[in-house]
Each structure stands twice: as structure tokens, then as C-alpha cells.
Amino acid sequence: MIRIAAAGDVHASEATRGRVESAFARIESDADVILLAGDLTTTGEPEQAQVLADACRDISIPVFAVLGNHDYHAGRAADVSALLAEAGVHMLDRSAQMCEVAGMQLGVVGTKGFVGGFPGCVLPDFGEPLLREVYAETGREADAIAQGLREIVHSDLRIVLLHYAPVEATVMGEPAGIHVLLGSDRLATPIAEFGADLVLHGHAHAGSFEGHIGQIPVYNVAVHVTGRDFWIFELEGVRGRSEVGVEGPA
């Protein structure tokens, strides 16, 4: 069994240093791995990333993370990633990594994802070059998920870590008019094709906790949704089959 502590939209800053450091100090005894689903900082400033880096530096369990839209706002996303990587965080950007956790081979595919909407209201590949580039960017994110899942196909457990939502079910609760900005069902296509045991994302602060891609569970782990610093998932499985238990808050 692997215990996964997941959180999205931590929005670290100097103002939240105490809460962030306390949350990470407590979680080590409750989890085997930590997954962070983007919006690691408030506005993407390196000084804000340093707060999270300080909290992660002495963590003895693996920490995986993807960036979110807030982490790009200041134009310093590369610096944010570098600071966290220097502190030992496995930063995933259209990439995948495998590691041994609790006696099992865990594979994590991580990328930010992007916008585009869901059936009934989607951005088409049509019109001005800027709009078509948005469509193309989401396609590149989906392609990265597919490639990552190919790379971790032999892992005992496979997780997809995103910021933007791949299903509309987990953004329900947000105004319908902004669903197109909260994710894209195109991100779900490679997950449905190649399979995964668990999909995690954030971004939709007023969204819903649970959805599915076929039989694959999808969870919105934004702290505003879970109401806790971390949510613990218990995964038990063997290659080709797994069971996910939602243990609860930590």
C-alpha cells in the first residue's frame, strides 16, 4: 500500500510561511509520497517559491510537483522550478518519473495541462493565430501525458498529476461561463487510452472533489475543495490492477 498526500493551490508566500511549514512538518508520518498539483506560489515570485522550498527541504519522503497558472504570472516560472528542484522536489513538466515507494514501483506523469473546455463548450482549432495557438498548446500537453504514460507503463501504480482539470465533473460548482478556462477534456483522451490508477489536479477552487475518466478516478485536490492542507489516498495494487482508497484529510 502507498499512502499519497495530495494538495493543490497551496499559494505559498511569506504571509503563509507558518501554515505551509507546519503542514509539511506534520505530513511525513502520515504519507509515503507527496504530490502537489500546481499553483505552488501566490503570484509566481521566486521569494514565494522559497517559502515552499524551505518547507520541503528536509522532507524525508519524495515530493512531486507541477506548476500552475499562478506560478507563471511573474514570468519567473523557470526560477520557481529551479528553487524547488534545488530543495529536492521532483518538478514535472511534460515529463514522467518512477521511484520505489513502500516496496512498489510508482510512476508519476506530470504536466500543467491547459484550457479548452468540455463537451458543449470547447475552443475549436479555428480563427485567429492566437486562438489556434491556445488549441495547439493544449494538444501539446495532452501529447506529453500520452508519452509519459508510455514511459511508466511497467510501473506497479501510475498517477497523472495536473493543474488544470481533465474532466468537467471536478469543476462543477464554478460558474459555467469559466469552465472553458478551468481545463479540457482533451487532457482525458490519453489517460483513457493508456490507463492510469489515479488522476489528481487543482485549479478549480469552487469545484467538486471527485470525477472519473471511464473507471479511472479523478480528484480535485485544491485545498479550497478538500478543506485541508493535504488529502490522503491509499493505493493498493499490482501491475495492471489497483484499488484506490480515499482515506481522508490530514
Feature map (PLM): residue ranges:
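N-terminal active-site segment of His-dependent metallophosphoesterases
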Residues: M1-P62, Y72-D79, L131, Y135-T138, ...
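Binuclear metal-dependent phosphoesterase catalytic core
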Residues: M1, A78, C99-A102, M172, ...
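Active-site environment of divalent metal-dependent phosphoester hydrolases
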Residues: H11-T16, T41-P46, H70-V80, M98-V101, ...
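Conserved catalytic scaffold of divalent metal-dependent phosphoesterases
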Residues: V10-A12, A78-H179, A222-H224, L235-G237
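Short, structured coil segments at secondary-structure junctions
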Residues: I59, A87, G214-I216
